[in-house]
């Protein structure tokens, strides 16, 4: 025993993990970095790649996280507090390293340790692959919420799917989006820890059969057609300058039996691994294309898989410290992030009734008290519905349970609204019109004690439109929780120059209490501060200009107005309205070469769903316009158009700080909230936008005079459509619009091919469901105001400062506090690191536990 290092002295009842794992000094960090490079990567510095060095640094930082993570877990086990479990199909986390350095407060010592080791921290941070676990705002919101939950010291577990290939990497070839496999895991993920000992089995397919149990009770048994194993992978999510590190648990699918030795022995080599291949497909990619029936089957199986794994995991955790599930809802508050996890309502009922033999009424009371449901969309196509044949084939027991839930629910409705058959049809979880289907948003609504929207307008529209009848039935269930974003990633990490400038004037308390930004307001009137502000902005714009040059070879003028629209490509987000304005500007300059226009750089980014042809055609149009404009010598620096491929969190961290103008131009009433609008405003961009989503609340906070408003309101949109909207009339009566559309149709941007953009133009001229033509002139006029305003740089800077100063409401910390108080009934639990680690540098572990 005397030859063992002190850390492994098993004669001591308390094992002291050596300081290199937890120490925070520069020398300790350098030593840990070298050790991890040698012992974990197996490399000498002379032969180590940059990725080896990144991995070694990541493991060094992860060691510091593990100390906090395990202390958090131990504290939660020892307290009787409720835990929020967040069910989300997406977590758009972004790279971990930089964020963890910010939250640990270790940026400076780590930077020094890395530089003294002959490396560059910026280069190592830039190497990290972005986790391919999300697509858009839904996943990024989940990531911001996880950050805020930990920062506010609220016990939480995030549950989701460990996608092997994420959504896709986007490349642009000949102007078209091309989807490339996102191999984000190919070089390893140092932040996760596999927990195969906590694997669970998930049933799919098969049939059900009734039976009578030993007590004479009627029961139903689900005989599965196949079994899939769920393997959890855990990632610590650390709060900002607290000791709380909550758990993100993501599930990977594997075959229950991955290799059939008998089939292999008789030469059936493919058959021997067939189960392995089909099972692992469940967690290969995010949102598989569901145009074909196989894609629909995979999506439903994927959603059910992660929900079942997560609920089984919660039950296992609960029963480890409780004799029954009677108080399950007192220990877990489960929040469903949109409709993807809504099958959880039926699954918890199945687990309670079939597996744990609860009577229906008691099981339902537990279920309803457990769940909350966040609605994120008003678009009918995004409100998931599954056809009964598909649903019944894949989840036969759940369909029976949903029928029972629906029957009991409609019985209640009949009692309150007798002789109202139309209302019953509108409220039924089963849609009887056309192909019969299960309405998942309705299942989530019926099975939850709380339903919320994500912006004031959105929540109101939820109550007035898609869930109107439910609101009339249960008004007390509905509330609004306006979204927010974390200032740690979107200001401190993304924009350190601006963050340091702000902190130099008002201190750094705003990082945890964003309302303190209000203290900036008086500085907007100080010429010296405005000068410092503009200096920071120009430096950040120069950074983005260099990045654009690296990616595209284009040289852009950092003194031009950076006009930015980066988000998922969708018709309702109206990237095509934006590019129509670009073409209008181009025509103005071509027709009047001496025109005094504010130089602009239009920057686009975003992905189109693989099966969404119109969105892909919009990307092609943007790139085709860019090709013409950027190569026209008569235009020069007055107009540049850039589409930067593969928009993700990393991309966002570059572009949000550099933007002058934030494009938030969705059709009023279509965007639930939006969070990009908040990130832009927090970084000093002014907004041009409609009265939609959180734009309304941003405008209320920053002041109407600091917001460029245009377009029809939601009631006006509804009225225009109801009166028989004729986009052709707008085209005929607006010379500017007609000139733009005619130029596109002439083949000017498509090498003479008049058919290329015809589907998009025909759609706008014929239907224009998102009122692009109706809002075109108002948008052009508002953009003219923007151009004039930008010429007065002093006043523009003042407006930008006030935008930032008034963004306190839009921290995700505020949002999470509201959820915790109004829906989850959860209080913070402070993690005292020194209780388990008296000197703050070690972790005490009992070998008997």
Curated annotation (Swiss-Prot):
GO terms for cellular component: cytoplasm. Transmembrane segments: none annotated. One of its GO terms (biological process) is glycogen catabolic process. The keyword Glycosyltransferase applies. Its EC number is 2.4.1.1. It holds the Pfam family Phosphorylase. Belongs to the glycogen phosphorylase family. Phosphorylase is an important allosteric enzyme in carbohydrate metabolism. Enzymes from different sources differ in their regulatory mechanisms and in their natural substrates. However, all known phosphorylases share catalytic and structural properties. NCBIfam families: P_ylase. This is Glycogen phosphorylase.
């Amino acid at each position: 025993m005397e030859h063992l290092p002190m850390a492994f002295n098993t004669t001591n009842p308390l094992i002291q993990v050596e300081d290199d794992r937890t120490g925070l000094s520069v020398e300790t960090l350098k030593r840990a970095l070298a050790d991890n490079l040698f012992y974990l990567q197996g490399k000498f510095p002379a032969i180590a790649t940059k990725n080896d060095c990144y991995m070694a640094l990541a493991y060094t930082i992860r060691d510091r996280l593990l100390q906090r993570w395990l202390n958090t877990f131990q504290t939660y086990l020892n307290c009787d507090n409720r835990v929020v479990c967040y069910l989300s199909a997406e977590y758009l986390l972004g790279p971990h390293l930089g964020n963890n350095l910010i939250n640990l407060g270790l940026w400076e010592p780590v930077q020094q340790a890395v530089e003294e080791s002959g490396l560059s921290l910026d280069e190592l941070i830039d190497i990290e692959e972005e986790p391919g676990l999300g697509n858009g705002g839904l996943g990024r919101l989940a990531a911001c919420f996880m950050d805020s939950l930990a920062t506010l010291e609220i016990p939480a577990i995030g549950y989701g799917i460990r996608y092997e290939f994420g959504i896709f990497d986007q490349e642009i070839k000949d102007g078209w989006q091309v989807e490339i496999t996102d191999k984000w895991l190919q070089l390893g993920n140092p932040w996760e820890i596999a927990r195969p000992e906590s694997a669970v089995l998930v049933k799919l397919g098969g049939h059900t059969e009734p039976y009578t149990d030993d007590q004479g009770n009627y029961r139903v048994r689900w005989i599965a057609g196949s079994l899939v194993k769920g393997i959890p992978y855990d990632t610590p999510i650390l709060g900002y300058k607290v000791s709380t590190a909550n758990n993100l648990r993501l599930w990977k699918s594997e075959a229950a039996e991955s290799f059939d030795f008998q089939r292999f022995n008789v030469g059936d080599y493919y058959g021997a691994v067939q189960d392995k291949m089909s099972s692992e497909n469940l967690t290969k990619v995010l949102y598989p294309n569901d145009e074909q029936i196989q894609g629909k089957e995979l999506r439903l199986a994927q959603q059910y898989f992660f929900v079942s794994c997560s609920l089984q995991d919660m039950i296992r955790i609960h029963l480890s410290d409780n004799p029954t599930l009677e108080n399950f809802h007192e220990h877990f508050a489960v929040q469903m992030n949109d409709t993807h996890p809504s099958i959880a309502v039926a699954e918890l009922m199945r687990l309670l009734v079939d597996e744990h033999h609860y009577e229906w009424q008691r099981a339902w009371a537990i279920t309803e008290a457990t769940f909350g449901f966040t609605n994120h969309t008003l678009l009918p196509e995004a409100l998931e519905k599954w056809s009964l044949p598909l649903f019944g084939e894949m989840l036969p027991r759940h369909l029976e349970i949903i029928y029972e839930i629906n029957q009991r629910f409609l019985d209640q409705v009949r009692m309150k609204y007798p002789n109202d058959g139309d209302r019953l049809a509108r409220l039924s979880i089963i849609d009887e019109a056309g192909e019969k289907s299960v309405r998942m948003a309705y299942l989530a609504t019926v099975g939850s004690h709380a339903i919320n929207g994500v912006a004031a307008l959105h929540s109101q529209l939820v109550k007035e439109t898609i869930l109107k009848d439910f609101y009339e039935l249960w008004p007390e269930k509905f509330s609004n929780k306006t979204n927010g974003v974390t200032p740690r990633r979107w200001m401190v990490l993304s924009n350190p120059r601006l963050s340091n400038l702000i902190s130099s004037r008002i201190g750094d308390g705003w990082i945890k209490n964003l309302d303190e930004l209000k203290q900036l307001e008086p500085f907007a009137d100080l010429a010296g501060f405005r000068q410092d502000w503009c200096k920071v902005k120009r430096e950040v714009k120069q950074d983005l200009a260099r990045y654009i040059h690296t990616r595209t070879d284009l040289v852009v003028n950092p003194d031009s107005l950076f006009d930015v629209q980066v988000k998922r490509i969708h018709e309702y987000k109206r990237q095509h309205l934006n590019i129509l304005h670009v073409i209008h500007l181009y025509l103005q300059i071509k027709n009047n070469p001496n025109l005094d226009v504010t130089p602009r750089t239009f920057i686009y980014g975003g992905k189109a769903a693989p099966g969404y042809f119109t969105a892909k055609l919009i990307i092609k149009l943007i790139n085709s316009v860019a090709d013409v404009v950027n190569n026209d010598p008569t235009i020069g620096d007055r107009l540049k158009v850039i589409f930067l491929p593969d928009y993700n969190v990393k991309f966002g961290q570059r572009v949000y700080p550099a933007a002058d103008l934030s494009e938030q131009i969705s059709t009023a009433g279509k965007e639930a909230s939006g969070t990009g609008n908040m990130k832009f405003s927090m970084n000093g961009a002014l907004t041009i936008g409609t009265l939609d989503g959180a734009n309304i609340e941003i405008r209320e906070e920053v002041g109407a005079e600091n917001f460029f408003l245009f377009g029809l309101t939601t009631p006006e949109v509804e009225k225009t459509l109801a009166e028989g909207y004729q986009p052709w009339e707008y085209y005929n009566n607006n010379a500017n619009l007609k000139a733009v559309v005619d130029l596109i149709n002439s083949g000017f941007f498509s090498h003479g091919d008049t058919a290329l953009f015809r589907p998009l133009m025909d759609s706008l001229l014929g239907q224009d469901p998102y009122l692009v033509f109706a809002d075109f002139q108002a948008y052009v006029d508002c953009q003219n105001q923007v151009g004039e305003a930008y010429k007065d740089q002093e006043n523009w800077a003042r407006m930008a400062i006030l935008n930032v100063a008034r963004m306190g409401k839009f921290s995700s910390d505020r949002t999470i506090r509201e959820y915790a108080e109004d829906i989850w009934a959860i209080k913070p639990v402070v993690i005292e690191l020194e209780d388990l680690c008296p000197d703050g540098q070690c972790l005490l572990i009992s070998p008997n536990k």
